[in-house]
Amino acid sequence: DTILTLWLGHIPEHAQIFVRLMLFLALTDAISYPLITAILATGDIKRYSLLAGGFNLLNFPLSYLFLYLGNPPECTVIIAIIISVGCLVIRLIILNEKLGISFNQYLKKVLLNVIITGIISSIIPLILYHEIMQPIVRLIVVILGSLVSSLFVIYWIGCTSNERNFVKMKASQFINRFRK
């Protein structure tokens, strides 16, 4: 609310839910990008483009239909999220056929990891949000708390030991640049 108030002054009726839904849509799309890259690397671009592109084309007519039937405007973003998840499933099916990537393995190693990391890293910012009443101070503290909480949880829970070693190596290289 604070960011929207600072940015817009007066918050339009559906702005808050739109922003939340758009952030969720961005997350679902971000999870898909590595899958898109893997599919393109297999060379099966035509089939992927027909399936995912065709499925994406449903966005406009479905949104129009749902708005025509009297649903609230945010239904368009919900439809986009459903289509994005559908495209994610299409990508996983293609990758299973081409590279043998298991749907269940992807759910466990990627999606479950993202969900658990997201939930745990949200605990401290939510506590801060409910404990601090001054809007500007709350905004700054919640942003900093989110940053610290997310970095900590991603590093210790979201990363494998190999990924943590990679981060340590890169951090060490970065620090050593300034020691010279």
Where are the predicted features?
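Conserved short cytoplasmic inter-helical helices of the MFS fold
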Residues: 2, 11, 43-47
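Membrane-spanning helices that line or support transport/gating and their immediate boundary helices
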Residues: 2, 6, 34, 163-166
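Short membrane-interface helical motifs at transmembrane helix boundaries
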Residues: 1-10, 65-68, 127
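Membrane-interface helix-capping segments at transmembrane helix termini in multi-pass transporters
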Residues: 4-19, 130-141
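Membrane-proximal transmembrane or re-entrant/amphipathic helices at the cytosolic face
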Residues: 96-103, 107, 125-180
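Short, amphipathic, aromatic/basic-enriched membrane-interface segments that mark the entry/exit
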Residues: 43-51, 104-112, 136-137
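Short runs within selected transmembrane alpha-helices of multi-pass transporters and secretion channels
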Residues: 17-67, 72-98, 117, 121, ...
